Curated annotation (Swiss-Prot):
It comes from the Eukaryota. InterPro entries: CT47. Keywords: Coiled coil. Strongly expressed in testis, low expression in placenta, and very low expression in brain. Pfam families: CT47. Residues 259-287 form a coiled coil. Residues 1-102, 207-288 are annotated as: Disordered. Residues 1-10, 207-222, 271-282 have a biased composition (Basic and acidic residues). This is Cancer/testis antigen 47A. Residues 81-100, 223-235, 257-270 have a biased composition (Acidic residues). PANTHER family: CANCER_TESTIS ANTIGEN 47A, GENE 6268-RELATED. Residues 20-31, 45-60, 236-247 have a biased composition (Low complexity).
Length: 288
């Protein structure tokens, strides 16, 4: 080896491949940028030259520099690691939305085919609730035959209930209102006091006696009225003039009728004679 200052062989060997491989990587990257954009997945594809160019210096560099170079090699140029991580969840969300839409469509189809399915369940719930209430309802009134027979009877039983009540007199009722108004209801109280109190029987026996007593009183009054009527024709005799007056009236009426009939007949005869005279005059005038 010459003394002109050749470097250490190991250092020369390390730098030489780095420079050569870096130039190759830059040339390959420029070519990929020009021709690789036309394809759909050009940003996702990592050039082989870049991987090779980075793999060479990893052996000679330190641990930190090697890790950085490996990270750059793993990430594609057209995107980032976050974009790659978002691709997976986006596709999953789209699939879930499609599945939900399909399920909703199936439900809508079922609802159109069977519109009364909900009403069926509502009716069943209503019937169930009604049966539950009827089974647990303890205050239902049931007719008792004995009580109904006792209630259906003569009207006297109902009257007995009302007969025991004390009578409400008009003065008491009006007096309560007059006490509230001092000086206004005195006239009403006096008028109510003048009204006789109604007689209210206390027992059924008295109520039964009243119609019998009324009937007996009516009979007595009728007998008393019949006796003076029978005595009047014996005491009072019609006078002779009163007895003859209607006979004269009856006799004079036919005579008047005969006179009227005779007058009417005489008038008819006169009219007939006048008509004959008129006809004779007409005949005589024609003959002349």
């Amino acid at each position: 080896m010459s003394a002109t200052g050749d470097r250490h062989p190991t250092q020369g060997d390390q730098e030489a491949p780095v420079s050569q491989e870096g130039a190759q990587a830059e040339a390959a990257g420029a070519g990929n940028q020009e021709g690789g954009d036309s394809g759909p997945d050009s940003s996702d594809v990592v050039p082989a030259a870049e991987v090779v160019g980075v793999a060479g210096p990893v052996e000679g560099l330190g641990e930190e520099e090697g890790e950085q170079a490996a990270g750059l090699a793993a990430v594609p140029r057209g995107g980032s690691a976050e974009e790659d991580s978002d691709i997976g969840p986006a596709t999953e969300e789209e699939e879930e939305e499609e599945g939900n839409e399909a399920a909703n469509f199936d439900l809508a189809v079922v609802a159109r085919r069977y519109p009364a399915s909900g009403i069926h369940f509502v009716l069943l719930d209503m019937v169930h609730s009604l049966l539950h209430r009827l089974s647990h309802n303890d205050h239902i009134l049931i007719e008792n035959r004995q009580l109904s027979r006792l209630m259906v009877g003569p009207h006297a039983a109902a009257r007995n209930l009302w007969g025991n009540l004390p009578p409400l007199l008009l003065p008491q009722r009006l007096g309560a209102g007059a006490a509230a108004r001092a000086g206004e209801g005195l006239g009403l109280i006096q008028e109510a006091a003048s009204v006789p109190e109604p007689a209210v029987p206390a027992d059924l026996a008295e109520m039964a006696r009243e119609p019998a007593e009324e009937a007996a009183e009516e009979k007595l009054s009728e007998e008393a009225t019949e006796e003076p009527d029978a005595e009047e024709p014996a005491t009072e005799e019609p006078t002779a003039q009163e007895a003859t007056a209607p006979e004269e009236v009856t006799k004079s009426q036919p005579e008047k009728w005969d006179e009227e009939a005779q007058d009417a007949a005489g008038e008819e005869e006169k009219e007939q004679e006048k008509e004959k005279d008129a006809e004779n005059k007409v005949k005589n005038s024609k003959g002349t």
